[in-house]
Amino acid sequence: MFENTIAAISTSLQDGAISIIRLSGDQAIEITQKIFDRNIMNAKSHTIHYGFIIDPDKNPVDEVLISIFRAPKTYTREDIVEINCHGGTFITRKILSMVLSAGADLAKPGEFTQRAFYHGRIDLSQAEAVQDMIEASNNTAATMAIHGIKGSVKKLLHPLIDDLMDIIAQIEVNIDYPEYEDVEQLTTNDLLPKTNDWLEKIDHILSRVQTGQMLKKGIDTIIVGKPNVGKSSLLNALLEEDKAIVTDIAGTTRDLVEGQIHIGSVQLNLIDTAGIRESNDKIEQIGIEKSQEKLKDAKLVLLVFDGSKELDEEDKQLLELTKDKMRLIIYNKLDKAEANKDGIWISASNKEIQPLIDALENLYQNDLLKEDPLLSNERQIGLLNLAKEDMLRAKEAMDMMVEPDLIEIDIQAAHDHLKEILGEVHREDLLDTLFSKFCLGK
């Protein structure tokens, strides 16, 4: 399928200890031999060779280690060579240029993984998981990515695909061999229980999609309260840095201030907001409106009150405003008051916030990842929803007693949409777009 040999820098292109230039293709070893001073043409697979990269005049260019991987037990199922050179930007580029001059083509973004997919080493969901691992910004996202690399999506979907194939096969037998006595006549009543069971399974997967996306990207967490209750002090304490301006003047925070923390293996995307109150200050009012907009989209609310004062009407309005949100009620300024109400008591200015950390850890346990695998990829989720829509149309047709051979069209469409998630049914232009989002050298 791929006749050329490709090469690219696989490590970050900046000065460092080591850089890796990767080649893949039938000529990978032969091309490397042209610029290496030791004989590697007959080298065994999965071996490392010390020597020097040399220019056409046999002058040494760099001291390197060459790793040889012979097909098919490689990342791409082609011959692969990895040149480990010193990590300077100049020397890395120079060696790549020599590799290209010796006969390799510069790899396109994601082309190594694309070859792994086309050669059947991984399915499309596993290829996407590779990119998810590269982009992972927290431990949970990395855990989800490694599950995907190990084939969790395929394991999740294959029972659904097999169920559809069973239904399609039953319909096909009735269409092709209606005259055989041992072929039981199929009716929509026979198909309906299997269809309902299938829809229940897919609904269970889709019900956990939002959780998967939150864990992958982080949980949008908004800090809400009246002015001067200590929201900015709390943000600074959580981030362990002075990111937000803190003063005794109410309304100091007029725009959104953001940061990220990790609680256990979960990432919280923190947003400190302007204090929500009635204000005649136009600039402050803009900040308050932004706060209210962010509140609508937030998945978790940290509702902060001044623990040294009784709740007033504005506090009660905030309780009402956030009642339908997942929230933690926090009383700040424990250094100035006694903990006399139910809630989480802290002193943000003194960095005494462990009760809040404990509450957050209890809120997001790792049990979420111990259940079925979670889907978080937008393409995969979209195709899963399309498959569900196909089967809902099929179910509607069954309720109307439509003939099974007509119902098969929607069932086949659902089957194809699930196979598309794994890349077993695909369009070349869409695959090119998908792999183009990968980094060079992967």
Each language-model region and where it sits:
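Short glycine-/polar-rich loops that comprise or flank the Walker A/P-loop
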Residues: 16, 46-48, 297-300, 324-327, ...
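Short alpha-helix of the ABC ATPase nucleotide-binding domain corresponding to the H-loop/switch region
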Residues: 250, 276, 284-288
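Short glycine-/small-residue-rich Rossmann-like dinucleotide-binding loops
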Residues: 239, 274-275, 299, 306, ...
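C-terminal-of-GTPase-core extension/linker across diverse P-loop GTPases
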Residues: 2-9, 13, 37, 52-54, ...
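Generic enzyme active-site microenvironment
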Residues: 270, 304, 330
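Switch I (G2) and immediately adjacent beta-strands of P-loop GTPase domains
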Residues: 50-70, 251-279, 297-300
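A glycine-rich (often HGG/GG-containing) alpha/beta subdomain
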Residues: 1-143, 147, 151
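Inter-motif core of Ras-like GTPase G domains
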Residues: 284-308
